[in-house]
Regions:
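A surface/extracellular/periplasmic glyco- and lipid-processing/surface-interacting theme
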Residues: 5, 9-42, 47-183
Length: 183
């Protein structure tokens, strides 16, 4: 039986920079590791009708994430909108070009393999794993910032919002459309 280890950080929605990790979704009989601890998962169709997952992590120490796979360029917008450090093991031609052109802070296992390890009990290439700690350590060595002033990732307000009920004759807080244009 597997044990899952995770530690939630003390501060809720801190200024810690998120991590986006590319995860294989064609793992056969092998289980994903760490998906349950992410803030959000993006699943997008890649070549051959398969899907790949990009998981975003923030304010959690996750000790095993994977299996980590290569980057695809169509995930980069989702990673960038959260100012995430982008973690992957290899890349497609388009992803490599876009990552370099856009200056995306990325931890690539082909060049920064200290952030990754292989589980020898699983057949390659589905056996590469990482952790949030290893990604942050490697990002610091690469002089990437590990904090952010961008509060884009799931920054919910706890302020209560009340709307009046028109059924009770209350008409405030209505949103009126003064004009509608269809083209």
């Amino acid at each position: 039986r597997r044990q899952r280890q995770m530690c939630i950080r003390d501060s809720q929605n801190s200024n810690q920079r998120p991590i986006a990790v590319m995860i294989d979704n064609n793992v056969g009989n092998n289980a994903h590791e760490g998906l349950q601890d992410s803030y959000i998962n993006y699943e997008i169709i890649v070549e051959g009708g398969l899907t790949r997952i990009m998981a975003l992590y923030k304010d959690k120490d996750v000790v095993k994430i994977g299996p980590v796979r290569s980057s695809r360029h169509y995930f980069l917008d989702f990673s960038s909108e959260s100012d995430a450090i982008y973690a992957h093991y290899g890349w497609s031609t388009y992803a490599e070009k876009d990552i370099k052109a856009l200056g995306i802070n990325n931890v690539n296992g082909l060049t920064s393999n200290s952030a990754y390890w292989r589980d020898k009990t699983i057949k390659a290439p589905h056996n590469v794993f990482t952790s949030t700690e290893k990604i942050y350590e490697t990002a610091q060595k690469m002089n990437y910032k590990t904090t952010t002033k961008d509060w884009k990732l799931l920054n919910y307000s706890v302020k209560e919002i009340t709307f009046k009920d028109p059924a009770d004759g209350e008409e405030d807080n209505r949103l009126l459309a003064n004009s509608v244009s269809l083209k």
